[in-house]
From Swiss-Prot:
It catalyses: (1S,2R)-1-C-(indol-3-yl)glycerol 3-phosphate + L-serine = D-glyceraldehyde 3-phosphate + L-tryptophan + H2O. The alpha subunit is responsible for the aldol cleavage of indoleglycerol phosphate to indole and glyceraldehyde 3-phosphate. Its EC number is 4.2.1.20. Tetramer of two alpha and two beta chains. The keyword Secreted does not apply. GO terms for molecular function: tryptophan synthase activity. It comes from Bradyrhizobium sp. (strain ORS 278). This is Tryptophan synthase alpha chain. Keywords: Amino-acid biosynthesis, Aromatic amino acid biosynthesis, Lyase, Tryptophan biosynthesis.
């Protein structure tokens, strides 16, 4: 049976376009608003949705996503509730792939086997766990693959040809190329450097390569999508959400649309790469 992820990339390939991949923090600014945002994203043009699992010590994340995680935790978000968020989303959307992104500790505490069973039954398609290197694949990666979940690995500008085969060995779904070194949201992506980096990764794998970190505008999204199988946007969407909150950090009537409207503009940027190529 074809996975949701493979089906989505096959569909995109047949349409001659790159994926628009969105990241939002699960439970930010509260579980109910978060579900409304996730439901709005496919209508805005998101092809794949990454949902952050809030964690108290998010070392790879910049200030925006760290703050989003803290807002979610303050609103009572847990890993169990994140899985429930996916389950609720799946009631109305059976096609859009969902990837959970975060850190190993909450999964370890939840229990790996139980987490994988619950994630699969909730309708999760893949995992990105930023603090588990390939040397620790037996912890979660191999069990996840056996459970039928994609395990998506990060590659960076410092991942050289010697290291790349280890990074790619058990990766499935897609490869997430981090276009800048450092934390999320720190700088703008350089589309010219991305092209050669994606080509280098593709010499080692047939998997789609999606590029993230530093994409904030439709123009940058378009430039990146011209070189990659997907463009990932997170910090810009999280910032749009934050700007819509009231003084106490609570959702307003504008919050869902603030995220969806920016997502729609970015989706147009990604689709513009296809038009430019034709």
């Amino acid at each position: 049976m074809t996975s949701r992820m493979d089906a989505r990339f096959a569909q995109l390939k047949s349409e001659g376009r790159s994926a628009f991949v969105t990241f939002v923090m699960g439970g930010d600014p509260d579980p109910e608003t978060s579900l409304a945002i996730v439901k709005a994203l496919p209508q805005a043009g998101a092809d794949i949705i990454e949902i952050g699992m809030p964690f108290t010590d998010p070392m790879a994340d910049g200030p925006s996503i760290q703050a989003a995680g803290l807002r979610a935790l303050k609103a009572g978000m847990t890993l169990r509730k994140t899985l429930q968020l996916v389950r609720s989303f799946r009631e109305g959307d059976a096609a859009t792939p969902i990837v959970l992104m975060g850190y190993y500790n909450p999964i370890y505490i939840y229990g790996v086997d139980k987490f994988l069973d619950d994630a699969k039954s909730a309708g999760v398609d893949g995992l990105i766990i930023v603090d588990l290197p390939p040397e620790e694949d037996d912890e979660l990666c191999i069990p996840a693959l056996k459970a039928g979940l994609n395990f998506i690995r990060l590659a960076t500008p410092t991942t050289d040809d010697k290291r790349l085969p280890a990074v790619l060995a058990n990766t499935s779904g897609f490869v997430y190329y981090v276009s800048i070194t450092g934390i999320t949201g720190a700088a703008a992506a350089d589309s010219s450097a991305v092209g050669s980096a994606v080509a280098r990764i593709k010499r080692h794998t047939a998997l789609p390569v999606c590029v993230g970190f530093g994409i904030r505008t439709p123009e940058t999204a378009r430039a990146i999508a011209a070189h990659a199988d997907g463009a990932v946007v997170g910090t810009a969407l999280v910032d749009a959400l934050k700007a819509s909150l009231d003084a106490e950090g609570r959702a307003t009537a504008k919050t869902v649309n603030a995220v969806a409207d920016l997502a729609a503009a970015l989706a147009q940027g990604v689709r513009g790469a296809q038009q430019a190529a034709e």
